[in-house]
């Protein structure tokens, strides 16, 4: 079966590098599915789970936003923050969500509001990714 090379990197480290049969991730306009030979594309990524189907099975990576570049034989995910699926911490995500909701209640400027909304979106997406991983196991 045809494959496409996938690199998922954050500012801190390379999270995944290898060949895949299929990649699914949350694009700015909705869920994207990438197969080998896909038309070139550059778009922003929303917080959520990147699902990478390899010959050996599925890999999950949580991204907190970033940029996606697709070429016919190569996919690059430049993530603001990326965490391997098995490294996600539900307690930390719940605490981050609670803190963001509290910040929304106590915001004093438009900047505080925007920051709190962004943090809430990331925490909520992280919890959804954790729930999705649990269903797969």
Curated annotation (Swiss-Prot):
Determine if Transport is one of this entry's keywords. yes
Report the membrane topology from the UniProt record.
Peripheral membrane protein
| Primary location recorded for the protein, binned into one broad class | membrane
Q: Does the keyword Ion transport apply?
A: yes
In UniProt terms, what function does this protein have?
Produces ATP from ADP in the presence of a proton gradient across the membrane.
This chain belongs to the protein called: ATP synthase epsilon chain 1
Q: Where in the cell is it found?
A: Cell inner membrane
MF terms from GO for this chain are: ATP binding; proton-transporting ATP synthase activity, rotational mechanism
Superkingdom of the source species: Bacteria
How is this protein organized at the quaternary level?
F-type ATPases have 2 components, CF(1) - the catalytic core - and CF(0) - the membrane proton channel. CF(1) has five subunits: alpha(3), beta(3), gamma(1), delta(1), epsilon(1). CF(0) has three main subunits: a, b and c.
Keywords attached to this Swiss-Prot or TrEMBL record, sorted alphabetically, are: ATP synthesis, Cell inner membrane, Cell membrane, CF(1), Hydrogen ion transport, Ion transport, Membrane, Transport
Name the family: Belongs to the ATPase epsilon chain family.
Gene that specifies this protein: atpC1
- Cross-referenced Pfam families, in alphabetical order? ATP-synt_DE, ATP-synt_DE_N
Q: Which GO terms describe its cellular component?
A: plasma membrane; proton-transporting ATP synthase complex
């Amino acid at each position: 079966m045809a494959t496409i090379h996938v690199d998922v990197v954050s500012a801190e480290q390379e999270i995944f590098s290898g060949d895949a049969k299929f990649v699914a991730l949350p694009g700015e306009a909705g869920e994207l599915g990438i197969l080998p030979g896909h038309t070139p594309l550059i778009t922003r990524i929303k917080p959520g789970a990147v699902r990478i189907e390899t010959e050996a099975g599925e890999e999950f990576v949580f991204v907190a936003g970033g940029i996606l570049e697709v070429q016919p034989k190569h996919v690059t995910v430049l993530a603001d923050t990326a965490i391997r699926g098995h490294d996600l911490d539900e307690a930390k995500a719940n605490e981050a969500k609670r803190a963001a909701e509290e910040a929304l209640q106590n915001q004093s400027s438009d900047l505080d509001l925007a920051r709190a909304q962004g943090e809430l979106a990331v925490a909520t997406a992280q919890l959804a990714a954790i729930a999705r991983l649990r269903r797969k196991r």
